[in-house]
Structure formats: C-alpha cells, structure tokens
Amino acid sequence: MEYRLSHRAQNLRRCMMDAFHLRDAKDMIFFNSGQPAADLYPRALLRAVLDELLAEEPQILAYPGSQGDEELREALAERQNRLDGGAGIRAEQIVVTNGGTGGADLLAQLFIDPGDTVLSETPTFPETLDCFAKAGARLAGVSMDADGPLPDELERLAQKCRPRFFYVIPNFQNPTGRCTSPERRRAVAEIARRHGFFIVEDDPYRELNFDAAPPPSYHSLAPDCTISMGSLSKTIAPGIRIGWLVLPEELVERAVMTLKATALCYPALLHRAAARVLEHPQFDAHIDELRRDLKRRCRLLTGLMSAQIPTGWLTWETPRGGMFLWCRLHGGVSAMDFAVRARDRWHVAFFPGVCFTPNYEGEDFSLRLTFARQTDAQMAEGVRRIAAALKSFQQN
C-alpha cells in the first residue's frame, strides 16, 4: 500500500545525532549524553511528594485542564522571579508543555507557516530546530563568538529574511557552554524591537552556574519582544517531561486551545509532584549539590585532557556552567571523520559540530563533549581513548 505522507511529515529531518547514540554498545563510553548522572536526580524528594499526593489528594488523578497545574505554574513563576529579579513573571503567563521540545513544537504551531524564516544561533540544539523545520520553516544561523550571537550578522539576516523569531540559548549554551554577555543581550533585543521579531529564549541551564550567576535574562531586559522557554529536565529529571513557555497574556488562550487540540490535558500527578519538589526546602540544597558536581566533573575532564592531549591536536573553551565542553580539532582533522573513527574503532562516542548547525553545514573541525553523566573511571578511560584516536590521526 502506498502511504501519502503530509507535507509536515515529509519536512521532518533525520537528526544527525542519532548515528552517535548507540545505547546498546556494551563497552562504549559516552560523552554525548546531555543529562545529569542518575544519582543526582532528587529521587527521595520525588518519592516523598508522590506518596503524599497519592495518599492525601487522590483527586489529582482526575482529568485536569490544559494550561498546566496551577500550583506548578505558581511555583515556576516564583522561582523564575527569584533567580532573575527583573523578570516579573506571573503564573497566568505560563503554559506548561511536554518538556522543552514540547514548548518549541507549540511555538511552531502558533507562529510558523510554511516558508517562514526562523533564525537561531549557530551552533545550537538541533532537536528544537527540528520542531521548526517540521512546520515548514526555513532555518538560518547567526554566528557566535565568546560573548554570544554577532549583532551585525543578526542585523543583516533580519533585513534580508524578515524572520518570525530568533531562537537563543543564552546561558551555558548547548553545545558551546557559552554565556551571552549583558551588552550582547541588549544589542540583540534592540535589533529584535527594530525589526519586529521576537526572541525565543530557551533557558534550561540557568541554575547550573559553577560560580557567579548568569546576567539578567532577555525576558527581564525586553519582555515586550521575548518568549521564554524553560525545562525541569536538567534540574529535576528529563523523564518527567516538564517544560513551559512564558507568553504574553493575550497569547495564552490561543496556546491552550492549541495544546488541547493536541493532547487534551497534562499528567496532573507529575505536575503537582514537580511543584512540591520546587517548593520543598531541600530543593535549593539539591541544586547546590548539582552545581558542585558538574563543576568537579568539568575540572576532571579538562584536567585529564590537558595531561594527555597536546594543544596542537585539540583545544577547548572552558565553560562557567552547564554540562558541555566545546572543542576544536587542529591540523586539518575532520570532526566527522574523527567522531566516526573514535566510535567504531575506539568505542568512545561524542557529537561532531556539524550536528548542531541549522542546515547541517559547517563546524567541520568542532566537536562537543559532555561531562554530566560518566563515572570518574569512565571519564578517565574515555579521555585515554580520545587521545589514542587523535594520535592515530596524527600518524596517518
């Protein structure tokens, strides 16, 4: 039988990252998992609040509404305002989604028609871009430096493409680990206002700073032209699939109508449990432990690499937070060739930089390592394998 797929289904891109996941490889060491180690999930807190809810609030298992649990939305607004003093977010502006990617998909349904242009930083997180591409968006990337997206390039593309919005990850960015400077944020906001597009601010890593907190958000600087995205995947657990959008109030009703037509309602038990975890006095201690562990892991990885890998072969940007190390190969070594050989011959997996580009072009000599999930022994063995793989390229 011949199946006639919709244009939207045909627009789906095969994610280049899929070739490097290889979860079944028995002795593979993974530097490609962007989630905390399982022992850092707040399991005791989750268990306690779930037991309490099931025992004392059985009505939580009934059909809920579509915007998201009210207690969760209030907890999210309170926490966002505490972390980012100028945000001024209210629970009524928040629409809870199925993880951060669910928020991106909702934005695509609300704003993108086939042929519209969406801008993003490049490199960036590709699975969000897949949501926009599925809706028929044309993708274009704005290059970055250590301070964030380049304003002159954004200005040029804004004039040329008339974008619907500009997608950014301002804090401890995936994949580069960079944090956009306050000056660069103000410049981006000014361009967005002048050209009449809005900024989609994806901020799942804000709380993962190693030392100093990140600068004020785009939302606090330019609430009139910013839609914020958030997620609990990095601070509680990815498996609970809780994300959210902060929308102008006049858009909330339309967003809820769209969600209702897609999934009717949300998993009320998990929403309420997440709210209770966020409100719990121990949650801040959990975040502090997560920060300390990620900082330690980052230092361990960079220390191992410094000891074993010559700077003529590989260099990297040391992040101030998050879970990603952005590296650059030298000597003309292709990141794709290196990643494939390292995976197949040395059984160590990571992503080449091209995976993080809007149209899978460029970043030929870049690669991303993560330091969030391995044991110390796995990290040490993984660096040994990376060094050996690099040496094999130098000898060719």
What do these predicted regions represent?
Residues M1, D344-R345, Y360-N396:
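PLP-dependent enzyme catalytic core of the Aspartate aminotransferase-like
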Residues R8-G99, L106, E279-H280, A349, ...:
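N-terminal small-domain helix-loop-helix segment of the aminotransferase-like
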Residues S120, G141, I199-E201, A274, ...:
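Hydrophobic residues in well-ordered beta-strands that form the structural core
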